[in-house]
From Swiss-Prot:
DNA nontemplate strand binds at residue 1421. Zn(2+) 2 binds at residues 111, 114, 154, 184. Mg(2+) 2 binds at residues 495, 497. The modification Omega-N-methylated arginine is found at residue 1603. The C-terminal domain (CTD) serves as a platform for assembly of factors that regulate transcription initiation, elongation, termination and mRNA processing. The trigger loop allows entry of NTPs into the active site, switching between an open and closed state with each NTP addition cycle. Zn(2+) 1 binds at residues 71, 74, 81, 84. It catalyses: RNA(n) + a ribonucleoside 5'-triphosphate = RNA(n+1) + diphosphate; a 3'-end ribonucleotidyl-ribonucleotide-RNA + H2O = a 3'-end ribonucleotide-RNA + a ribonucleoside 5'-phosphate + H(+). The modification Symmetric dimethylarginine is found at residue 1810. The modification N-acetylmethionine is found at residue 1. This is DNA-directed RNA polymerase II subunit RPB1.
């Protein structure tokens, strides 16, 4: 669809991409215009007399009815006709239920009578709204609505303005104002809705109808809306062009086409109509009835009923789930499916059919393991392979293979299913009688069966992350399941217990290329989610690897040979055996070392490694062989296990991937598996019941432990019964008891488990699996052998089910271990029935949990993805969403991709000042130490040179500053960070590669180190730009890495620790730079989806419910999925809101002070400190009823300070709890004060002393005096005293705050045990120290109040309530808090997610300046397009809004494009490729007129001597011959610049404009990347370093077949000798033409006219002379300035900077030649310019080549025409066998210079004397001309270069020899454009005359008798002014027209003016080069 070509055969019409989608409401006129049923649909019936009825609901004009029929409107058949809308004219308008709410809003904004806006549009507020809501019509309506809500009168002009205080000038302005608004001044009704009806009510009686409330008919609303002006529509957020308010009321109802409501034909004749058709029938019926009644003048109530019914039917057609309305049913009682239900929900139209569809070319079956496949292969059953097809385009190269497949048809396996002819006909081979009769032609497509090597996508649902869909290569295997390598199960999360997987076969070559380059399994080994590998070695291989690398594994010679057989990368050398006598034995480690690729270095530990071995004097000795050291690719010591080969960061696999690349790592995986599994076959591994039996002593031990544990539990129970158990702080007695019991039982289980494990021997097979990490854990072993342990439900012991017991077998209230679910048996011993039951309870809980969790996390993941789906890295490296809002300025804040970073330690952060100085300061005073580390001359330099010493001091200063910065960034002293380029490992690599001896002094100058690091850090650019902001951003992005770089590569460590040589150091810097650049995130990467998956995937692994920390007396916090849900929903009320309060100063260390603060925070009510309350009738206070209070009460009443008479006889006595009072530091006085403050004088409150035995408050009501008098009268109303007192009591207990903050219900105080909560300080001597300080943690939050408390640290105190942090501290704080909370949730169960994903989520949620929840309320309130929103949630509402407001969707996001089936702007879709049209002229046409190049059978040209695995070439690889030929057809004579002699391209006049005759410069030929064959540096297919040089080897090169091992199998189409466009018989090609390229066969070196002694005619012809850069034999490294390049030739000024061969920008015009491309590195040995074949003295180098023009831009050395092959190579020369070393050093495939090999000259035979250019018989017109024998006829099939036996001169040159493919399309020496020196080279154009200065026409070699060559021939006459070399235009070097006649000194080719640097001559000045 992209780009406009015809899509896949369905419709021939070209499609353009949709740029935006406009929504709107259709107006009645538009509906009628669009409708195909004139006059509307009148009849509810569908058929009449068995025929569809015109004007009925199956009107034949609306679409096709029968399968066989045609549409009456468009005459299309079922597949073609899209259906056409009809319409129904409603008798009366009705409301559209989707717009009902909008209708009401608009009604409330305009005047009910005059339709004016209720707010004057000149009102400044309106202007403000309009300015603020550009492009957001919905927002505009909301704001205007808010303004209008308060208006209840439609004002006239003046009052309106005065009200707003607008100054009123007198006179005319007044009138204009009044006109301006001119309201009618009437009161506005309130609009109410009931069901589907609207009512208007007035506060005052309405003037018109004298009623307060009237029914608002749709007509009336329609009238009001009609009168609204367009301007006011706009203010109301409508877009008058697309959606006017009155259109929201249905007057004409569109009838959907038949294809939308197809009728189902049942058996028999009856049709089952669709729900919509039923609904429409109802509407038509009632509409007709209404119209009849109206015409007949029926009673008003009848009509009203009809309208109501019509309204109901229209509404339920749109939405049948309306609240408050009955459902519209079918007869059967099933609710009808309305339009809304069709769209919404998972199965609806949007999510079910547009966003996701079922696809073709997919297969699904069960998976089974196969360790012998490579990780990127998948075994496909033959039955599937024979059913799935791939459409391959027929080209001359694959025609034979495809013809064979077609012959086999569909019945045999490698066959084909269909042929698609170029006219679109599809031939089905399944039903074709004789497929062998079908002939193919190029351009047809053959749908062939899937075969080995095809690329497919393999997927397992649920697709949680991008590693759930990966590219694999097919391997056809027998039987019916997919087979895959064991290691790939981890990313797919697959196992083989019956899982099924899906396979998709991509149908185009682009898709294939993308999968191969981006999604193949090996490229996915390292996940960006947590920067570690996702695949490791698993199962039996892992078990075996651990056994195999133990110390005592020895292998015999036979075994070793056998294993080496399985090592695919084995080089044929058997290593020296470790043991020689008595017989040679090899160790397992030796064999494993052969598997390890490259020079890998790695240190890990084995799983059983004891920690105490890491430090101490013996840290280098590992007695248990548990330290793994791999050095330089050799396993030196250590047993490998899951730690080294698993999916952990820094494992061997990870390092291999980072250092060696994905392909080598793929082999590593395969080799480990094949070799080790085959060893395991010899060795064996089994497990039986015997492995699970321990010895009797162990069993005794276990019994005793359990007995003791039970005893302990009983003791605890007794303690609890006797009330001796002290509750731990913050817990109740029950909790304390449970915690203790749990602890005892868990300890018992652990203890028995460990004793069981100790008893197992080293050879136990259980143990060997656990130790290697393959399966199982220690718990599993202990459960099998010792004890199963306690069963839990919801984190507690099994609860009592009924009657206080768990099961009826136990007594009531039994808290003992057995009754509450402790299983004391092991699995081996078997469980008792009760134990079994409890065990099942625990297990069942796990199942339920899993099921619930899956749904929860699935939804979370979907929301995450939808909220971030379009967030991507753009080409300016910022991270933006689809509406181009910046989310992050640099991805992950450092601009790096997640896959390429690793954990590293910052060396300077931790050590104390002393250690820091010792390690990092270069001590130039200590001479002895210097001599040990540096070489003598360096020592002298350092000691004597003050400048150096200053530099070194400065370096140390810089590191000290870095350390300060680090300590601010990481205040906790945690030095583990994630950075690119593992420096320590790179240094280690350097030491190995350069064989550094760490004991010898180094020759690396300290200053060089300092300078080198400085230079390097300048090169590591993340943010380009030189303005202050960019510079700051660059510093922020690279700060950590630079610090790390400076501290690792500091001069001291270089000299002392690493001892690198200068050379090694340079290599290291280069390596760091390139690795760093590779780590930068790619633009186009969809980081949003990546982040969403990286968070969603670990969430799936989390447990759903919160297990509380058993036994810890801390608050419970929500964790896991519920907490994640709270965070991303931004819930206002989290389940467990909590503050962490840090304290200041003394309080932090002093428990008492901390307790004071705790009391100040914790909310205390009276209830919390009350022991009991009672109400007494106690009329006489002096002798109180409560005897114990008598004493102190008397004290009060002896001297009352109040009126004793007023006291009520009722007494409220409150007894307080002494313990709680002291806990909360409360005194009686405080409480009494609070009571008095609350109730004042109405209560009398007395209390006893704080030290009294019981603390008592006595409270009485005080009656006021007046009440005393009037008591009798008012008895009725007054509450009794005792009742009143009771109310006061409850009020006091609950509502009265004694102290603290209301929201904070409880505060816990604790000393942190973990370091992350301790206070970290830095001591004087610079060490980190963690101090324990008291921390308060609260239940409930009130951040604002707590922060303002005294002694609270306002900086560190924080809340876990996100919303609260936002309100208190703002958006930046909440972003950090959110990030921290998310990190906490994820890391709680030990997962790790790279920071950049969390950061991206937090930034997405906060980048708008407010918190955006990841729910429909957040995501769908953004400014994204309606299509994206409707694909998330609220589908119909979103679309209705969009329509009503006339919104448009700019189609920038992912969902939008997927819905419309377009390429989304993501990844490879977010850029376009620029086609260089100029270059297209040089495209080669593929000769399509030969029956088949491969006619000679498999050895023919197709398979070459290196048959490719696919058998030839994948057809679709040659896009050229689909209509593109002319575009690339510079070769076809019909095209202007072709070779036709008269064609403009070659006429001297045309060229002269362009080039001033400089032969090398012509518009027709400039080989830049656009030329179809040029390989681009990124060319994915570079099979060999050499190959890259050949331009024809680019992926697009038609002939290129990616899998052909030899590179150029000679099938390149462009070379068929019979191709009309350059068949030598073509007239313009006459070889006798003088300028016919000398390498053309007709100048055979043996032909007399070609004497190599002629100075200017070196055997390879001057036109290929080395000075012609386009033919430089050294190709890329050839540069005219390259000093080794004939330095004596003046034209190569060695000083010209612009050509330095090492300059990376070396290829000014073509990326494909960039010297950095692997295959052309100038240092590559094959390019050495001194290689014999390029010695500057070789005649072929003569700088005097006539046509060489150094200034010609297309001769830049990048011109593809420089074949790297040796110029002087002549195949007939004996020493040039193709094996000769300098034969084409970089490109095996061809040497254009070999005259004998120009395949395009079919009849050429280098030794044939008759072939001289003058040979009369070689007339261009003789097509079948054969110089020596009929078999040479160029069209003769035998002669095709594909004929294997054809060899022009010697057997070595068979064209099938892959080394020599004649077919490289670009280098045809005979191609006119390939005369490298003259692009426009048409043999007949005069331009190329021999008069070029060095081409001396009198040179004897040129047989002057040659008729065409006559030097006097006018066209070439050397004197002809047009072509005279002296003519200014011709001077090859003279751009400016200065005359260089060849006789003039200036033109001597050796004269200095000819030098490239001479300013007068370089049009392509150095700036162009760089």
């Amino acid at each position: 669809m992209h780009g406009g070509g015809p899509p896949s055969g369905d419709s021939a019409c070209p499609l353009r991409t949709i740029k935006r989608v406009q929504f709107g409401v259709l107006s009645p006129d538009e509906l009628k215009r669009m409708s195909v049923t004139e006059g509307g649909i009148k009849y509810p019936e569908t058929t009449e007399g068995g025929r569809p009825k015109l004007g009925g609901l199956m009107d034949p004009r609306q679409g096709v009815i029968e399968r066989t029929g045609r549409c009456q409107t468009c005459a299309g058949n079922m597949t073609e006709c899209p259906g056409h809308f009809g319409h129904i004219e409603l008798a009366k308008p009705v409301f559209h239920v989707g717009f009902l709410v909008k209708t009401m809003k608009v009604l409330r904004c305009v005047c009910f009578f005059c339709s004016k806006l209720l707010v004057d549009s000149n009102n400044p507020k309106i202007k403000d709204i309009l300015a603020k809501s550009k492009g957001q019509p919905k927002k505009r309506l909301t704001h205007v609505y808010d303004l209008c809500k308060g208006k209840n009168i439609c004002e006239g002009g003046e009052e309106m303005d005065n009200k707003f205080g607008v100054e009123q000038p007198e006179g005319d302005e007044d009138l204009t104002k009044e006109k301006g608004h001119g309201g009618c001044g009437r009161y506005q009704p309130r609009i109410r809705r009931s069901g589907l009806e609207l009512y208007a009510e007035w506060k005052h009686v309405n003037e018109d109808s004298q009623e307060k409330k009237i029914l608002l008919s749709p007509e009336r609303v329609h009238e009001i809306f009609k009168r609204i002006s367009d301007e006011e529509c706009f203010v109301l957020g409508m877009e008058p062009r697309y959606a006017r308010p009155e259109w929201m009321i249905v007057t004409v109802l569109p009838v959907p086409p038949l294809s939308v409501r197809p009728a189902v034909v049942m058996q028999g004749s009856a049709r089952n109509q669709d729900d919509l058709t039923h609904k429409l029938a109802d509407i038509v019926k009632i509409n007709n009835q209404l119209r009849r009644n109206e015409q007949n003048g029926a009673a008003a109530h009848v009509i009203a009923e009809d309208v109501k019914l019509l309204q109901f039917h229209v509404a339920t057609m749109v939405d049948n789930e309306l609240p408050g309305l009955p459902r519209a049913m079918q007869k059967s009682g099933r609710p009808l499916k309305s339009l809304k239900q069709r769209l919404k929900g998972k199965e609806g139209r949007v999510r079910g059919n547009l966003m996701g569809k079922r696809v073709d070319f997919s297969a699904r079956t069960v998976i089974t393991p196969d360790p012998n496949l490579s990780i990127d292969q998948v075994g496909v059953p033959r039955s599937i392979a024979a059913n799935m097809t791939f459409a391959e385009i027929v080209t001359p190269f694959n025609i034979d293979r495809l013809q064979e497949l077609v012959r086999r048809g569909n019945s045999q396996y490698p066959g084909a299913k269909y042929i698609i002819r170029d006219n679109g006909d599809r031939i089905d081979l399944r039903f074709h009688p004789k497929p062998s009769d079908l002939h193919l032609q190029t351009g047809y497509k053959v749908e062939r069966h899937m075969c080995d090597g095809d690329i497919v996508i393999f997927n397992r649902q649920p697709t949680l992350h991008k590693m759930s869909m990966m590219g694999h290569r097919v391997r056809i295997l027998p039987w019916s399941t997919f087979r895959l390598n064991l290691s790939v199960t981890t990313p797919y999360n697959a196992d083989f217990d019956g899982d099924e997987m899906n396979l998709h076969l991509p149908q185009s070559l682009e898709t294939r290329a993308e999968i191969q380059e981006l999604a193949m399994v090996p490229r996915m080994i390292v996940t960006p989610q947590s920067n570690r590998p996702v695949m490791g070695i698993v199962q039996d291989t892992l078990t075996a690897v651990r056994k195999f690398t133990k110390r005592d594994v020895f292998l015999e010679r036979g075994e070793v040979m056998n294993l080496l057989m399985f090592l695919s990368t084995w080089d044929g050398k058997v290593p020296q055996p470790a043991i020689l006598k008595p017989r040679p034995l090899w160790t397992g480690k030796q064999i494993f070392s052969l598997i390890i690729p490259g020079h890998i270095n790695c240190i890990r530990t084995h799983s059983t490694h004891p920690d105490d071995e890491d430090s101490g004097p013996y840290k280098h000795i590992s007695p248990g062989d548990t330290k793994v050291v791999v050095e330089n690719g050799e396993l030196i010591m250590g047993i490998l296990c899951k730690k080294s080969l698993g999916t952990s960061a820094g494992s061997l696999v990870h390092i291999s991937y980072l250092e060696m690349g994905h392909d080598i790592t793929r082999l590593f995986y395969s080799n480990i598996q094949t070799v080790i599994n085959n060893w395991l076959l010899i060795e064996g591994h089994t497990i039986g019941i015997g492995d699970s039996i321990a010895d009797s002593k162990t069993y005794q031990d276990i019994q005793n432990t359990i007995k003791k544990a039970k005893q302990d539990v009983i003791e605890v129970i007794e303690k609890a019964h006797n009330n001796e158990l002290e509750p731990t702080p913050g817990n109740t007695l029950r909790q304390t008891f449970e915690n203790q019991v749990n602890r005892i039982l868990n300890d018992a289980r652990d203890k028995t488990g460990s004793s069981a494990q100790k008893s197992l021997s080293e050879y136990n097979n259980f143990k060997s699996m656990v130790v290697s990490g393959a399966k199982g854990s220690k718990i599993n072993i202990s459960q099998v052998i010792a004890v199963v342990g306690q069963q839990n439900v919801e984190g507690k012991r099994i609860p009592f089910g009924f009657k206080h017991r768990t099961l009826p077998h136990f007594i009531k209230d039994d808290y003992g271990p057995e009754s509450r679910g402790f299983v004391e048996n092991s699995y081996l011993a078997g469980l008792t029935p009760t134990e079994f039951f409890f065990h099942a309870m625990g297990g069942r809980e796990g199942l339920i949990d899993t099921a619930v969790k899956t749904a929860e996390t699935g939804y979370i993941q979907r929301r995450l993805i939808k909220s971030m789906e379009s967030v991507m890295v753009k080409y300016d490296a910022t991270v933006r969403n689809s509406i181009n809002q910046v989310v992050q300025l640099r991805y992950g804040e450092d601009g790096l991709a997640g896959e390429s970073v690793e954990f590293q330690n910052l060396a300077t952060l931790k050590p104390s000042n002393k250690a820091f100085e010792k390690k990092f300061r270069f001590d130039y005073t200590n001479e002895r130490a210097l001599r040990r580390t540096l070489q003598e001359d360096l020592v002298k330099d350092v000691l004597s040179n003050a400048h150096i010493q200053n530099e070194l001091e400065r370096e140390f200063e810089r590191m000290r500053e870095d350390r300060e910065v680090l300590r601010v960034i990481f205040p906790t002293g945690d030095s583990k960070v994630v950075l690119p380029c593992n420096l320590l490992r790179m240094i280690w690599n350097a030491q190995k590669i350069f064989h550094i001896n760490p004991r010898l002094p180094s020759d690396l100058h300290p200053i060089k180190v300092v300078e080198g690091v400085k230079e390097l850090s300048k090169k590591l650019v993340i943010v380009n730009g030189d303005d202050p902001l960019s510079r700051q951003a660059q510093e922020n992005a690279t700060l950590l890495f630079n610090i790390h770089l400076r501290s690792t590569l500091c001069s001291r460590r270089m000299a002392e620790e690493f001892r690198l040589s200068g050379e090694a150091f340079d290599w290291l810097l280069g390596e760091i730079e390139s690795k760093f650049n590779q780590a930068i995130a790619h633009p186009g990467e969809m980081v949003g989806a990546l982040a969403a998956q990286s968070l969603g995937e670990p969430a799936t692994q989390m447990t759903l419910n919160t297990f509380h920390y058993a036994g810890v007396s801390a608050k419970n916090v929500t964790l896991g999925v519920p907490r994640l849900k709270e965070l991303i929903n931004i819930s206002k009320k989290p389940k467990t809101p909590s503050l962490t309060v840090f304290l200041l100063g003394q309080s932090a260390r002093d428990a008492e002070r901390a307790k004071d603060i705790l009391c100040r925070l914790e909310h205390t009510t009276l209830r919390k400190v009350t022991a009991n309350t009672a109400i007494y009738y106690d009329p006489n206070p002096q002798s109180t009823v409560v005897a114990e209070d008598q004493e102190w009460v008397n004290v009060y009443y002896e001297m009352p300070d109040f009126d004793v008479a007023r006291i009520s006889p009722w007494l409220l006595r409150v007894e307080l709890d002494r313990k709680h009072m002291t806990d909360r530091k409360l005194t009686m006085e405080q409480i009494a004060e609070k009571i008095n403050a609350g109730f004042g004088d109405d209560l009398n409150c007395i209390f006893n002393d704080d030290n009294a035995e019981k603390l008592v408050l006595r409270i009485r009501i005080m009656n006021s005096d007046e009440n005393k008098m009037q008591e009798e009268e008012e008895v009725v109303d007054k509450m009794d005293d005792d009742v009143f007192l009771r109310c006061i009591e409850s009020n006091m207990l609950t509502d009265m705050t004694l102290q603290g903050i209301e929201q904070i219900s409880k505060v816990y105080m604790h000393l942190p045990q973990t370091d992350n909560k301790k206070k970290i300080i830095i001591t004087e001597d610079g060490e980190f120290k963690a101090l324990q300080e008291w921390i308060l943690e609260t239940d409930g939050v009130s951040l604002m109040r707590v922060l303002s408390e005294k002694d609270v640290d306002p900086v560190r105190t924080t809340s876990n309530d996100i919303v609260e942090i936002f309100t208190v501290l703002g958006i930046e704080a909440v972003r950090k808090a959110l990030e921290r909370e998310l990190y906490h949730v994820i890391s709680f169960d030990g997962s790790y997610v790279n920071y950049r994903h969390l950061a991206l989520l937090c930034d997405t949620m906060t980048c708008r300046g407010h918190l955006m929840a990841i729910t429909r309320h957040g995501v769908n309130r953004q400014d994204t397009g309606p299509l994206m929103k409707c694909s998330f949630e609220e589908t119909v509402d979103v679309l209705m809004e969009a329509a009503a407001h006339g919104e448009s969707d700019p189609m920038k996001g992912v969902s939008e494009n997927i819905m419309l089936g377009q390429l989304a702007p993501a990844g490879t879709g977010c850029f376009d490729l620029l086609l260089d049209a100029e270059k297209c002229k040089y495209g080669m046409e593929i000769p399509t007129n030969i029956p088949g190049l491969g006619a000679a059978g498999p050895t023919g040209m197709f398979f070459g001597s290196a048959p490719s695995p696919m058998g030839g070439i994948s057809p679709a690889m040659t896009p050229w011959n689909q209509g593109a030929t002319p575009a690339y057809g510079a070769w076809s004579p019909s095209v202007g610049s072709g070779m036709t002699p008269g064609a403009a391209g070659f006429s001297p006049s045309a060229a002269s404009d362009a080039s001033g005759f400089s032969p090398g410069y012509s518009p027709a030929w400039s080989p830049t990347p656009g030329s179809p064959g040029s390989p681009g540096p990124s060319s994915p297919y570079i099979p060999s370093p050499g190959g890259a040089m050949s331009p024809s080897y680019s992926p697009t090169s038609p002939a290129y077949e990616p899998r052909s091992p030899g590179g150029y199998t000679p099938q390149s189409p462009s070379y068929s000798p019979t191709s009309p466009s350059y068949s030598p018989t073509s007239p313009s090609y006459s070889p006798t033409s003088p300028n016919y390229s000398p390498t053309s066969p007709s100048y055979s070196p043996t032909s007399p006219s070609y004497s190599p002694t002629s100075p200017s005619y070196s055997p390879t012809s001057p036109s290929y002379s080395p000075t012609s850069p386009s033919y430089s034999p050294t190709s890329p490294s050839y540069s005219p300035t390259s000093p080794s390049y004939s330095p004596t030739s003046p034209s190569y000024s060695p000083t010209s900077p612009s050509y330095s061969p090492t300059s990376p920008s070396y290829s000014p015009t073509s990326p494909s030649y960039s010297p950095t491309s692997p295959s052309y590195s100038p240092t590559s040995p094959s390019y050495s310019p001194t290689s014999p074949s390029y010695s500057p003295t070789s005649p072929s180098y003569s700088p005097t080549s006539p046509n060489y023009s150094p200034t010609s831009p297309n001769y830049t050395p990048t011109s593809p025409s420089y074949s790297p092959t040796s110029p002087s190579y002549s195949p007939t020369s004996p020493n040039y066998t193709p094996t000769s070393p300098n034969y084409s050093p970089t490109s095996p495939s061809y040497s254009p210079t070999s005259p004998s090999y120009s395949p395009t000259s079919p009849s050429y035979s280098p030794s044939s004397p008759r072939y001289t250019p003058q040979s009369p018989t070689y007339t261009p017109s003789s097509p079948s001309y054969s110089p020596s024998s009929p078999s040479y006829s160029p069209t003769s099939p035998k002669y095709t270069p594909t004929s294997p036996s054809y060899s022009p001169s010697s057997p070595e040159y068979t064209p099938t020899s892959p080394k020599y493919s004649p077919t490289s399309p670009k280098y045809s020496p005979t191609s006119p454009k390939y005369s490298p020196t003259s692009p426009t080279y048409s043999p007949t154009t005069p331009k190329y005359s021999p008069t070029s200065p060095t081409y001396s026409p009198t040179s004897p070699v040129y047989t002057p008798t040659s008729p065409k060559y006559s030097p006097t021939s006018p066209t070439y006459s050397p004197t002809s002014p047009k072509y005279s070399p002296t003519s200014p235009t011709y001077s090859p070097t003279s751009p400016k027209g200065s005359t260089y006649s060849p006789t003039s000194p200036g033109y001597s080719p050796t004269s200095p003016t000819y030098s490239l640097t001479s300013p007068a001559i370089s049009p392509d000045d150095s700036d162009e080069e760089n």
